[in-house]
Regions:
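Catalytic cores of nucleotide-sugar-dependent glycosyltransferases that transfer UDP/GDP/TDP-activated
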Residues: 1-560
Length: 560
């Protein structure tokens, strides 16, 4: 048996599915070795993909695909387990054949994509190209094969397999329905009106009918249909017309950790950031400061970003006797690091280096109380700050000048004035892919006091689970699949606050009290809290949960 797992997010960081795949891959490699492969789209400048020569037995397939405008890349994903990967470069194929295949999928499945846009056409063309590749494999491999596809973006491959009657058993996993995500992005509470929604009609009114039809047909024709939470199971049955065969919670690949050491290392980075980003403008009492963050895709209403900003506005005007610095890690289009921010960062790096090189001289002047000479040494290298200026809200120059997050922050009076109790750092980039935020994500986030996730639409909620894995006190919406799973597993904790976002204004004082409670913990008590939170994450370990998928694979293998 060979297993092929397909997703648009293989070696391509977009959202939570990237974490699903990258965190469980090592367990599937351990079980299936070289019989497990991942398939994704080929993108230029992929950091984590290590390309290798095409295997000898696939050379003819490589040539056949090339004649169709499909370029096959082979190698491994440079993560734990180093799973083998096929990445499909398909843009020549896209240009040549997109209209033909849109017609064929109308003929086969009545998918109405005549007026579809690029957000459909691009992954659709890729999924067909993957289908053609798997068809070529089917000609030379007679043994049992399984395709496990994620989200509607991979759905075209399953439908290709079924239309061509290829020798593959298929699994489809959805992580959120097209209709649910779209309605929620318009600030509509899907679960409140789910019984009133005619999904097929609604899809046309929202102009997402082609994505919905792809998703619905994939759910209908796959051999096994799975999803990641009870909420999404209800949604799938209503919108896609099929109840999932299995709910399998997302998990992480966990390892024992030194929580105290990790926290202190990350905290040092965080305090150093505040030193160069804020301190040139005004003093911040770090001992009286609470560091909070949120992280996720740029979905303003779905991720509850507006609610987080409303909370900060409330706290800024409240009687809270703490400083709060909120980091918003929400990637979007940027042209580069803001000029002023880059100057501050470079000045700080130079000062650090200069201090090390002149340390003996500086100590000599200190001993002799020659403070003016120390000032003279550094004067030329200190950043020049104009009068009445303040730290930038956003770290990078945004392509979109009417950025909704930035505008909401400014409208809410969160503009980093010295008098503000709440300061904000809006970082619109992926952590670890930037010279300012140049460490792996976990090495930055572990230094925060509280993570906050107030999603309206979050069928599972990986960011909150990762926060729990880091041992960080968590504020989480009651609408997420993860928060409901905590209840189902009886894993509630006083260090994890569930927020009723339907009655958000009534919850504000409760959230403030939670923040004050966390900030009041003595360091040793705080470490105990972190260990308690981390222990909750152990109930979401792929080491155990992966067996759910393995059982499905083995069952399908026995049916072939």
């Amino acid at each position: 048996m060979k297993i092929f797992e397909e997703s648009w997010e293989v070696c391509n960081k977009v959202g939570g599915i990237y974490t699903v795949l990258s965190s469980k891959a090592e367990h599937l490699v351990k079980k299936y070795g070289n019989d497990y492969f991942l398939i994704g789209p080929y993108k230029k400048n992929i950091i984590e993909f290590v390309e290798e020569d095409i295997p000898f037995e696939l050379e003819q397939i490589y040539k056949n695909l090339l004649n169709r405008g499909i370029l096959l890349h082979y190698g491994y994903w440079d993560i734990r387990g180093k799973p083998k990967v096929f990445l499909i470069e398909f843009y020549d194929f896209f240009k040549r054949e997109i209209n033909y295949w849109k017609y064929k999928y109308w003929e086969w499945y009545q998918i109405d994509s005549l007026n579809s846009d690029y957000t459909y056409d691009e992954p659709f063309a890729w999924s067909v190209a993957v289908g053609i590749f798997l068809e070529e494999l089917d000609k030379i491999y007679n043994f049992n094969k399984i395709l496990h596809a994620h989200e509607w973006l991979s759905g075209g491959t399953i439908l290709y397999i079924k239309a061509k009657k290829l020798n593959y058993k298929t699994i489809f996993t959805t992580h959120g329905t097209v209709i649910g995500r779209t309605l929620s992005s318009k600030n509509i509470d899907v679960m409140k009106i789910i019984d009133k929604i005619d999904a097929d009609k609604e899809a046309y009114s929202l102009n997402i009918h082609y994505k919905h039809q792809m998703e619905k047909n994939t759910a209908k024709y796959c051999d096994v249909f799975t999803t990641v939470s009870e909420i999404l199971s209800i949604e799938s049955e209503k919108f896609l017309g099929r109840k999932p065969d299995k709910i399998i919670y997302n998990s992480l690949s966990l390892e024992e950790r030194d929580i105290k050491k990790e926290f202190l290392i990350s905290r040092k980075w965080l305090e150093e950031f505040i030193l160069w980003y804020f301190m040139p403008y005004y003093e911040i009492d770090l001992k009286n400061t609470i560091f909070m963050y949120t992280i996720g895709r740029y979905e303003f209403y779905n991720k509850g970003i507006d609610l987080i900003i409303d909370l900060m506005k409330y706290l800024n005007k409240s009687d809270i006797n703490k400083n709060i610095i909120l980091f918003l890690f929400i990637p979007t289009g940027v042209s580069g690091i803001s000029g002023n921010v880059l100057k501050l960062y470079n000045s700080y790096l130079f000062l650090k280096e200069f201090f090390e090189s002149e340390k003996t001289e500086i100590i000599k002047h200190l001993i002799r109380r020659e403070y003016d000479k120390i000032k003279q040494l550094f004067e030329d290298y200190l950043p020049k700050i104009s009068k009445n200026s303040k730290p930038s809200i956003v770290t990078h120059d945004l392509y979109e000048k009417t950025d909704i997050i930035l505008n909401k922050l400014i409208e809410s009076g969160l503009d980093n004035e010295e008098k503000d109790k709440v300061k904000v750092v809006y970082a619109p980039i992926y952590i670890g892919q930037d010279i300012i935020f140049n460490l792996p994500k976990e090495k930055i986030l572990r230094g925060f006091d509280i993570g906050i996730f107030l999603s309206r639409y979050e069928p599972f909620g990986y960011t909150a689970l990762e926060n729990v894995y880091y041992g960080i006190p968590t504020i989480i919406s009651n609408k997420t699949g993860f928060s409901l799973s905590l209840k189902n597993k009886n894993l509630e904790s006083k260090y994890i606050l569930l927020v009723d976002i339907d009655n958000f204004n009534d919850e504000l004082e409760k959230i403030k009290d939670f923040i004050l409670f966390i900030s009041s913990l003595e360091f040793e008590k705080y470490l105990e809290a972190k260990k308690e939170i981390y222990n909750i994450a152990k109930f979401y370990d792929w080491k155990n949960e992966i067996n759910e998928y393995i059982h499905i694979y083995e069952t399908l293998n026995n049916l072939q």
